[in-house]
Curated annotation (Swiss-Prot):
SMART domains: Knot1
PROSITE patterns named in the record: GAMMA_THIONIN
Function field: Plant defense peptide.
Keyword terms of this UniProt record: Antimicrobial, Disulfide bond, Fungicide, Plant defense
Coiled coil location: none
Disulfide bond keyword on record: yes
Protein name: Defensin Tk-AMP-D2
Cystine connections: 3-49, 14-34, 20-43, 24-45
GO biological process: defense response to fungus; killing of cells of another organism
Family: Belongs to the DEFL family.
Gene3D superfamilies: Knottin, scorpion toxin-like
Length: 49
């Protein structure tokens, strides 16, 4: 199962999965990707849980 959490450190709309993943690693998540959230793309961090 994968648990997802919106990044707390990522600023602004998310257009780059690699940037998102880099920020997520600083938040102790192994990976992250951009996902649509209403009208804005946000960075979501993922880990196995």
């Amino acid at each position: 199962r994968t648990c997802e959490s919106q990044s707390h450190k990522f600023k602004g709309p998310c257009f780059s999965d690699s940037n998102c993943a880099t920020v997520c690693r600083t938040e102790n998540f192994p990976r992250g990707q951009c996902n649509q959230h209403h009208v804005e793309r946000k960075c979501y961090c993922e880990r196995s849980c």
